[in-house]
């Protein structure tokens, strides 16, 4: 348990289903709100939660197992590395994964799990 912050990228995601939270998004948030506290929980608001219940809109496809056509926002490698440097405790996002839908390497998972970030 710790302090929580919300980084809102709904505007960027509205026009780009494959948008990824960037390091610039994080530093912009910090310019307005101050440094992300260590051991905090970072919540990323993409606006994708409004599509919950509609597989095609939420995932980009409604065909089970069709991973080639997944499209939803996530967190970039650079953003994950910056969050790890900030020593956050945990991360949450309103999409199906912290990696964006079209990922093939799941690098965001690798970076954050490697830093023991839940």
Language-model features: where?
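Active-/binding-site microenvironments in catalytic and ligand-binding cores
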Residues: 1-118
């Amino acid at each position: 348990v710790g302090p929580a912050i919300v980084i809102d990228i709904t505007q960027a995601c509205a026009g780009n289903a494959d948008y990824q939270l960037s390091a610039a998004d994080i530093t912009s948030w910090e310019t307005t709100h101050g440094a992300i506290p260590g051991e905090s929980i970072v919540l990323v608001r993409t606006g994708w939660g409004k599509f919950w219940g509609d597989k095609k809109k939420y995932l980009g496809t409604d065909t089970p197992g069709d991973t080639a056509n997944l499209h939803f926002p996530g967190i970039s490698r650079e953003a994950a590395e910056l969050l790890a440097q900030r020593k956050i405790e945990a991360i949450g996002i309103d999409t199906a994964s912290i990696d964006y839908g079209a990922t093939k390497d799941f690098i965001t998972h690798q970076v954050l799990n490697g830093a023991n970030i839940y």
